[in-house]
Amino acid sequence: MMQLSREERLLKVESMTNVRDLGGYETQNGYYTKSHKFVRSTNPGNLSKDEKEYLYDYGIRVQVDLRSDFEVDQQPSALKGYKDIEYYNINLLQSKNLNVLPSEVRNYHDLSGFYVFMLESNKEQFRQVFEIFYQHPYNAIMFNCSAGKDRTGVIAALLMDLAGYHEYDIVKDY
């Protein structure tokens, strides 16, 4: 296993932005993480047939969609039902929780308070996501939200921290 550059981690999927493999980083104990295991992305709703085949050939066999029911209804995943890819939808932005967003979170000048609130108010959903990861140790897993930033970024940061990535790599990837 070897270190991959940022360019080597980027998957070439024209209809999506922010699609990258989380593998190929050196961990704190000197090992390198495996590529073709976890891929973070934006919503794969507009994939062409060739792009679906590219992701399939890349090894994607599980998709964890972190979007709300409304977002999924507006633009369903093109990978849902494609070949033998398993699809899971775990809504990480429960609308019932957003209605009670504490004022201290609303008043933050950055998103850090929102991320903490998201973690605290969606513990069961985060558990479900990591349970899916645990159940598929040999499959490549793609996880996404709409833009591939906030919800996807939190999951990616947690995975990277669990795997022992250097903090600067976690921040840089985020």
Where are these regions (language model features)?
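Ser/Thr-glycine-rich phosphate-binding loops at phosphate-binding pockets of nucleotides
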Residues: 147, 151-152
